[in-house]
UniProtKB/Swiss-Prot annotation:
Primary localization: membrane
Source organism of the structure: Staphylococcus aureus (strain MSSA476)
Protein keywords: Cell membrane, Lipoprotein, Membrane, Palmitate, Signal
Signal peptide: 1-22
One cellular component term from this protein's GO annotations in UniProt: plasma membrane
Lipid group attachment sites (S-diacylglycerol cysteine): 23
Membrane topology: Lipid-anchor
Protein name: Uncharacterized lipoprotein SAS0401
Lipid moiety-binding region (N-palmitoyl cysteine): 23
Amino acid sequence: MEYLKRLALFISVIILTIFIMGCDSQSDTAENPKEGSKEAQIKKSFSKTLDMYPIKNLEDLYDKEGYRDGEFKKGDKGTWTISTDFAKSNKPGEMDSEGMVLHLNRNMRTATGHYTIRTTYDELGKMTREKNYRVELKNNKIVVLDKVEDVNLKHKIENFKFFSQYADFKDLKNYKNGRISINENVPYYEAEYKRNNSDGNVKKLREKYPITTKQSPILKLHIDGDIKGSSVGYKQIEYMFSKEKEDETFMSDFLNFGPSHSN
């Protein structure tokens, strides 16, 4: 009987040891994702463009090559599309957003786009209110092509800065404990990271935009398309500062490379 008790105790210790080792292993994986994990792959996919941040001179993109596939026609050097948009709910049931998109054609070495001011409504049937102003990039400066009555708005557009012009993701590889969402049938991949208000990129966003919430934001790295690269899908960054209905606040940004004929 005494022998059986010792045997049972020994087996229990072995099982407990295996369980603890398993937990430690899972914890290490969460904090330090393996090279082949989906989190590591998402970071690697984003690093192809984020390593270029900050892009001080947008016209440098004319000389930057991006991911190419069969969607490109022979001789097409491709087009970079860059966009930054800030959205905030200032009234119940309304969302106001402003932002700019530019298409930098590497064949023609021209950059055209528009600045958009938009208000969307939760109320069913109420139409979105939107105003677009055509712009172009000349000597790394934004030039407004449409007449803008509001002098302050014109100045705001001309001095607009894309997130990619001042953001820095050199430490992206050190971001830990990402919340990963995957649907390989679509396909899409997403990694979410809690960022502190002391984060350099967060500080710069708070300086540039009317972010009233004190909450620390969630950074989303979203890939729509092949995680290894595709000119059909897109990659987008989003900083979500608040999801509260009456104070929803976020900034979205993307830099993508694709065939020129798609613009």
